[in-house]
């Protein structure tokens, strides 16, 4: 069975760090994918991008048009299209049950920043000491993407980014679907810190308490 290496674009709402990197470092991304493919015999690469990112799609399709080992696949924009099992099925047709790992189906799935970190380490001998973090939401003073060193606290990052607006109601580390509410801003940025989402009163869902019955 042919091995497949898939780069997935993040599908969480609000997060744009991987999208910006696809626009700004497409050649490095493709070279990083080739580094991974070189580790296996008869391996093919797939870059899976949702169809709401036409500029990134056009750039990567242009760069891989004559590349026999890499294919750009355009996926429908829906959540959780970028989840590991879903992206393997939609790009390869291979099904993975709850007891299987991607490797059992001959697949590896990584995100954009991981593949770029591989490129930096192998091709530029640069260690992985930072990542791009999305700061966004209606209550963020200056929403944009920041390259942040590991170990910097969330509080320090927010201060560097201009802080929060007065209407900030809730902070989430990560995206709105899989992220965690933040209660301590002194926690450090790590390799898994994808974003800080500052939500206003209008963005926070309110529920009226009801009786718990069947």
Report each predicted region and the residues it spans:
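Conserved "landmark" site that anchors the functional core of diverse proteins
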Residues: 1, 18-20, 27, 42
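Short, small-residue-biased leader/transition segments that mark boundaries at the very start
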Residues: 2-7
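Gly-rich Lys/Arg/Thr-decorated short loops/hinges at beta-loop-alpha junctions or inter-strand turns
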Residues: 8-18, 139
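Histidine-anchored nucleotide/phosphate-binding helix
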Residues: 23-39
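Hydrophobic alpha-helical positions that pack around
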Residues: 43-154, 160-165, 175
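Ubiquitin-like/PB1-type beta-grasp interaction modules and other compact soluble beta-rich domains
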Residues: 133-135, 165-194
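Glycine-rich and small/hydrophobic secondary-structure elements
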Residues: 189-205
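Cysteine-centered iron-sulfur cluster-binding motifs in ferredoxin-type domains/subunits
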Residues: 206-214
């Amino acid at each position: 069975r042919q091995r497949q290496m898939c780069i997935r674009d993040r599908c969480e709402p609000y997060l744009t760090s991987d999208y910006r990197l696809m626009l700004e470092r497409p050649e490095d991304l493709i070279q990083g994918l080739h580094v991974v493919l070189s580790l296996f015999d008869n391996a093919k690469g797939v870059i899976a991008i949702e169809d709401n990112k036409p500029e990134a799609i056009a750039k990567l399709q242009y760069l891989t048009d004559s590349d026999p080992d890499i294919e750009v696949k355009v996926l429908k924009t829906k959540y959780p299209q970028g989840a590991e099992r879903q992206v393997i099925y939609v790009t390869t047709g291979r099904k993975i049950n709850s007891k299987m790992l991607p490797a059992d189906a001959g697949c590896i799935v990584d995100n954009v920043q991981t593949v770029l970190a591989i490129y930096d380490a192998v091709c530029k001998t640069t260690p992985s000491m930072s990542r791009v973090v999305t700061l966004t939401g209606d209550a963020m003073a200056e929403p944009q993407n920041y390259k942040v060193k590991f170990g910097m606290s969330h509080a320090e990052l927010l201060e560097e980014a201009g802080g929060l607006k007065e209407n900030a109601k809730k902070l989430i580390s990560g995206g709105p679907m899989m992220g965690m509410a933040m209660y301590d801003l002194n926690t450090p940025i790590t390799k898994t810190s994808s974003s800080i989402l500052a939500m206003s009163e209008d963005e926070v869902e309110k529920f009226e308490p009801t009786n718990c019955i069947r």
